[in-house]
Amino acid sequence: MRRLLPLFGLLWAASAAHADVRLHPLFADHAVLQRDRDIKVFGWADSGEKVTVSLGSAMVSMTTPASGKWQVSLTKRSASITPASLVVQGKNRVERTDILIGDVWLCSGQSNMEWGLGGCDDPDAIRSSGNPLIRHFGVEMLFARAPQETVKGSWAVAGPSTSGGFSAVGYYFARKVVKETGVPIGLLRSSVGGTNIECWMRQETLLDTPVLKPFADRMRTSLAQYQIDLRAWHKAVDAWVKAEAKRVAGGMDVSFPPEQPKFPFGEQAFNPRCVTLHNGMIAPLGNFQVAGVLWYQGENNAGNAFEGNQYIEKQRAMITDWRTWFGTPNMPFYSVQLAGWQKQSTDAAGGDGWSEFRDAQRRSLAIPFTGMASAVDIGDVDDIHPKNKQDVGERMALWALRDVYGRKDTVVSGPLLKGVQSGKPGTLVLAFDHAGGGLMAGKMAGRGKFEPLPATAIGGFVIAGDDRVWHRATAAVDGDWIVLSAPGVVAPKFVRYGYRMNPLDANLYNKAGLPASPFRTDPQ
């Protein structure tokens, strides 16, 4: 056997020297490639191998460098619904068919982004989902210690046999955009349930962002301890091998070896799993051009008020990180404001972790080229995974339609607090952006079903004076203004709206049927 080992080595070396030219897995049959930008195509081949890439009539060649990694750029193209073939010719020939040019949207976050259309109790959506202009690539989950270059997954065309596995939020987003614009949409889903935002950033970002320092310190401490434990384990294994040799010689059974230490940020190390998902599921996508990001995450970061307040800086750090990674400084980033969950608190003040978190999400709109689709009104008391993903996806699509697709008259958001001032004695007057034709009371009565309510029914507001004793307020609509008062508050100064984990009484909308974001005006 020992004589055969060198031969196996030579055979492996010979096969490696004549490895097939390969494309990155993102370039597969049915792929959507980003329009209006130079198209980067990349993969692997032998050092020195000439690689020629063609897409339709466009063709470009290069010689593979010593690293074995090649990348070419094809001239940018407009959106096209005509399928094309992508061909790579080296020592072998690789062809990918049914390629469209359109917009690729990265769908990331936790389980509510991962949630498939098949789990939404919407069989009509699946039955009618056949559309060659909507495609989906699901990135296989991978926690990685170091940045990876490749992923596992495949492209699928929307249809009754495939759409059940699509990200539901992504699918409803794409369905609306395609209907309005005719531009092919590729959904690049890279999401994992139960994950913190810290999982999705590069290590450099984690280390350089002050608010993330506790996670960075925990990461360094855990990795240092892991190295100590690993060295001790190697010594224990050496001792075990020697001891077992004697046991075997004496005719005894072999015992179990010492247990290997677990890597501290692997799949089973549930919290916080820093960096590892960026390494495994974002880093490999970096050269693949995308139009923007759809982000539904936060349940794992909303556990308490302190975490909620910090989220704006964490999200700012991650957005900057991703825009740098994808080489697009103004990349659109649209997030979902957390849906309501569990029973409504009877405490007038509210102020739990989820309410603080939603307010941080609202304030994150100050980050340029971002948008927020509120889902606060379409939650589920009993399920952290509400089935109504249609309104979530379509509300995200509104931002894209206005900011990416030029539909400038689109109402993209529900009312957002603009300012507050004292009115007549005993009242506060609130002004709102995104009034959308006027403020009103309303409710959602199912997917895509908005029902107006009498103006006198507006709820969800509480006010307080300097004493910070909160009282439920009566709200009156005055055009794009809300006037608040409460019998127990002579000199109101502060207001909160929908400031609970599940604010079922918060029902302020604009006439476009979009809900107001929860907020607070008292200092935190």
Range-by-range predicted roles:
Residues 6-8:
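Sec-dependent N-terminal signal peptides
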Residues 13-14:
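N-terminal signal peptide c-region/cleavage motif recognized by signal peptidases
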Residues 1-4:
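Positively charged n-region of N-terminal signal peptides that target proteins for export
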Residues 19-524:
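Cell-envelope and extracellular/periplasmic
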